């Protein structure tokens, strides 16, 4: 039996025309009864696989719409003498039977697929024998399992891949991963790639397109199985590089299962090591050697098993080295980052220390400013004390001479001195009167030394005005008002309102009580003045009949400072209400030595002075109660003391 082999470059071809298609035998191979005369399996389906990059020359079979085997005019010279032989008929029948099986299997596999026209012809291919690989398989068993096919696979071989050519070309290396090893070997061997399935393997695969498992020869039409290996369909399932909603991936059968497992085990570290390796080494073989690490497919050639094993071992060693290098690089990078972070912390600490230093300096400056302000305030207070007229017993202060003169002649001042005269010896009360008059004269002399007295007085008033530091948007201004100390009430500076307040019953009752408390407080101030060492010495001299107010200028300055301090303490304590009471109570014990100088000249006066001293604690307690807001509780005792005085 002779047959014609369809090998590129051969001179023998076979041409036969069946005019009577009904005479063609039918056969059942477990898939149903197929007749080549029908259109089943051929209509709308073009199947071709070869190795030419272009389809200009077509070698092999091409199915025409007339259901006849015809060779194209561009084929090699036909041998018409062999068309009438019986052996040719049997050969063609077997060929038709086997070709009927292929489209049926493909149509079952590609459910809902869109196929090309039936008029397309088969492209040329190189002879390849796959019997060595498929010897253990059944006669008509395909190279993949039907159970793993998805019914939703819908794809067109002609036009649906065109839109993804560029995308697939860019992602071809990473998408197919290790399964693309066979394609790379074919590309290095200089063998032309296949252009079957329309343009399926032409542009999308490029140099990565893969041949069938038998890389040396294609299967013969008379072999046990003419169906191509599942390696032919790599890249058609899963991966996400193709449209249509179906899951295209890395082959079928056991290979697809293995690739599913390996795909799940892939991590981003594998791709990172690839990139680092390429950047460092730059050799084109490293991605292929790394790809063999996860290659678990069965479609490797038997002739190249040793070579692939060598490549796999080299790939494993290379990948391990790459991983180690990447780990070392990662550790180095982490160390560098840590060093940078540590380096950043030091300047931060330095910045913090500088901030602390700045804060400390600011605090020191603020403290210095506060101390300076306090010093200025003290100096101002001293200046005010020197130029201001003061009546310590009545707690009256003023910057003007006429006001001070009017105060000394006022009823208020005289009543206070009368009350003090009833509680103290007459000579002591007279000494206090002379002391206040002499102090007023000294203040007048000090005021004459000041050049701009009026400006100084105005400056003092400005300093006392706290509203100057408040901005105008707060709408706060200084106003003049009358303060009623008896009623503890501020009254607007209006004549009618002030007169109305003065005529009220509450004000009259409060002012009488306040007058008694003011007299008692004046007695306490008098005792505090007499307890001063300098003033007590003057009092002794005054009692002896000498003039105590004719001292040297140096002594006068010392006395003024001492007297000013004592009087100011008493006056400020009385004004505050608390400090005065505290000073008045402890000031009482030193008072008893006062009768000693009085007892020397007139013996009778000491006993009355001692009796008067017994009433002093009551005055102090009444003052404390008045300060605490309970005025008038000691009125009866005060009236008794006051009644005895007049």
UniProtKB/Swiss-Prot annotation:
Predominant localisation class: nucleus
Residues forming coiled coils: none
BP-aspect Gene Ontology terms: cell cycle G2/M phase transition; mitotic chromosome condensation; mRNA processing; nuclear membrane disassembly; positive regulation of transcription by RNA polymerase II; regulation of mRNA export from nucleus; RNA splicing
Compositionally biased residues, Basic and acidic residues: 287-296, 337-349
Composition skew (Acidic residues), residue ranges: 298-314, 552-563, 634-646
GO cellular component, one term: nucleoplasm
Segments of this protein annotated with the region Disordered: 264-381, 545-646
Motif (Nuclear localization signal): 274-279, 362-364
Modified residues (Omega-N-methylarginine): 208, 217, 237, 247
Summary of the tissues where the protein is detected: Ubiquitously expressed. Expressed in the brain cortex (at protein level).
Zn finger residue spans: C2H2 AKAP95-type: 391-413, 484-507
PTM annotation: Phosphorylated on serine or threonine residues possibly by PKA; probably modulating the interaction with TMPO isoform Beta.
Family: Belongs to the AKAP95 family.
Subunit details: Interacts (via N-terminus) with DHX9 (via RGG region). Interacts with TMPO isoform Beta, PRPF40A, RNF43, lamin-B. Interacts with HDAC3; increased during mitosis. Interacts with EBV EBNA-LP. Interacts with HIV-1 reverse transcriptase/ribonuclease H.
Protein name: A-kinase anchor protein 8-like
């Amino acid at each position: 039996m002779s047959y014609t082999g369809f090998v590129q470059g051969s001179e023998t071809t076979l041409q036969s025309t069946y005019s009577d298609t009904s005479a063609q035998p039918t056969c059942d191979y477990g898939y149903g009864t197929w007749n080549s005369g029908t259109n089943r399996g051929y209509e709308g389906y073009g199947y071709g696989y070869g190795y030419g990059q272009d389809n200009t020359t077509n070698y092999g079979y091409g199915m025409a719409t007339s259901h006849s085997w015809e060779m194209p005019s561009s084929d090699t010279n036909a041998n018409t003498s062999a068309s009438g032989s019986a052996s040719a008929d049997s050969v063609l029948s077997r060929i038709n039977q086997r070709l009927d099986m292929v489209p049926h299997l493909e149509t079952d596999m590609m459910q809902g697929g869109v196929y090309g026209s039936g008029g397309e012809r088969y492209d040329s291919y190189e002879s390849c024998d796959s019997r060595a690989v498929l010897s253990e398989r059944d006669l008509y068993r395909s190279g993949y399992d039907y159970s793993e096919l998805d019914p939703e696979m819908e794809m067109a071989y002609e036009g649906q891949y065109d839109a993804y050519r560029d995308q697939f070309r860019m992602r071809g290396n990473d998408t197919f991963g290790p399964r693309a090893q066979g394609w790379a070997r074919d590309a290095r061997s200089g063998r032309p790639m296949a252009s079957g399935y329309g343009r399926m393997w032409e542009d999308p695969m490029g140099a990565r397109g893969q041949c069938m498992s038998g890389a040396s020869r294609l299967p013969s039409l008379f072999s046990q199985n003419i169906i191509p290996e599942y390696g032919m369909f790599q890249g058609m399932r899963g991966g996400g590089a193709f449209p249509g909603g179906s899951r295209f991936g890395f082959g079928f059968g056991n290979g697809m299962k293995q690739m599913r497992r390996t795909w799940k085990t892939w991590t981003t570290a594998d791709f990172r090591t690839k990139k680092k390796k390429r950047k460092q080494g730059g050799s084109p073989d490293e991605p292929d050697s790394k790809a063999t690490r996860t290659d678990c497919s069965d479609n490797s050639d038997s002739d190249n098993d040793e070579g692939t094993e060598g490549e796999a071992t080299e790939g494993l060693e290379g990948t391990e080295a790459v991983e180690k290098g990447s780990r070392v690089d990662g550790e180095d990078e982490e160390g560098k980052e840590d060093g940078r972070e540590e380096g950043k912390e030091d300047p931060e600490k330095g910045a913090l220390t500088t901030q602390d230093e700045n804060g400390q300096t600011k605090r020191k400056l603020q403290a210095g400013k506060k101390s300076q302000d306090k010093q200025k305030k003290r100096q101002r207070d001293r200046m005010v004390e020197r130029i201001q007229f003061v009546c310590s017993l009545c707690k009256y202060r003023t910057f003007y001479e006429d006001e001070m003169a009017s105060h000394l002649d006022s009823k208020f001042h005289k009543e206070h001195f009368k009350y003090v005269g009833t509680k103290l010896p007459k000579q002591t009360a007279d000494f206090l009167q002379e002391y206040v008059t002499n102090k007023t004269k000294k203040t007048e002399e000090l005021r004459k030394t000041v050049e701009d007295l009026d400006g100084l007085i105005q400056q003092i008033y400005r300093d006392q005005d706290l509203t100057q530091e408040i901005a105008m948007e707060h709408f706060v201004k200084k106003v003049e008002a009358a303060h009623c100390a008896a009623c503890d009430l501020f009254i607007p500076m209006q004549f009618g309102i002030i007169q109305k307040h003065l005529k009220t019953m509450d004000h009259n009752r409060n002012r009488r009580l306040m007058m008694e408390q003011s007299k008692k407080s004046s007695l306490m101030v008098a005792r505090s003045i007499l307890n001063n060492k300098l003033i007590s010495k003057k009092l002794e001299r005054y009692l002896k009949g000498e003039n105590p107010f004719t001292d040297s200028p140096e002594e006068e300055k010392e006395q003024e400072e001492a007297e000013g301090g004592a009087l100011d303490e008493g006056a400020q304590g009385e004004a505050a209400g608390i400090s005065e009471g505290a000073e008045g109570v402890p000031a009482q014990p030193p008072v008893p030595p006062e009768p000693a100088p009085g007892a020397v000249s007139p013996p009778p006066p000491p006993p009355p002075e001692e009796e008067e001293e017994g009433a002093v604690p009551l005055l102090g307690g009444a003052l404390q109660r008045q300060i605490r807001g309970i005025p008038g509780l000691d009125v009866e005792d005060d009236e008794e003391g006051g009644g005895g005085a007049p």
